[in-house]
């Protein structure tokens, strides 16, 4: 597998980079190609133009992407640009499955996902891009297949947004652009090897607290039968819903699953005092505050 990344400022940069890829020996020798796109420009027309250009110039390519606060190129954050990362596989194969939850009923999407999983051979990894907060069913959707038991690494991201921005502007995209949806990329190959490592730069602190009530998988209502918003007031002195993310992001909750620590960063406190997350929280789990280890 070969990887090439470019930070582009406009569509001219994109076309130039894509043509360079097309004329390369790596592209000509590739069996399959994936282009991941990360963009700060929450403009459907711009995104559609970029994705159409990719598919027109690179006829082998599958596309997946999302809107985000900032992209990363060569491991460094890059502000004010769109990032294109091209993966070129000589022997492995790529499949992309996407659902728009405005158009497709959740149960129908779940069945299609499970059927796809059952029929894929030599599946080695899954990448997921989704619109957090837009579709409350994302976590439930992914749990329709036991990925841990199948020992298939899963990784990805949720579309990001600036603090105070309107969540409706979050977008993910594959063949189409979705305001409420999910784009799943399957990596397959008999000789493909994917090394997955879990790292977390947070250190747990304080006592464990039990999740006692959850709404829609990702809205925490009570902890130890105390309103979740009051927990932040009592321990961190955060009383206002305004700038809630900025005031709490340095002290995320941590929980253990399958022997590994996971972090849950609250992004919103609603008018009822409930705390919203972009990933699932389960009733009965033990939460503990944490702080940055470095």
Over which residues does each language-model region extend?
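Small-residue-enriched flexible segments
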Residues: 1-55, 61, 66-68, 75-125, ...
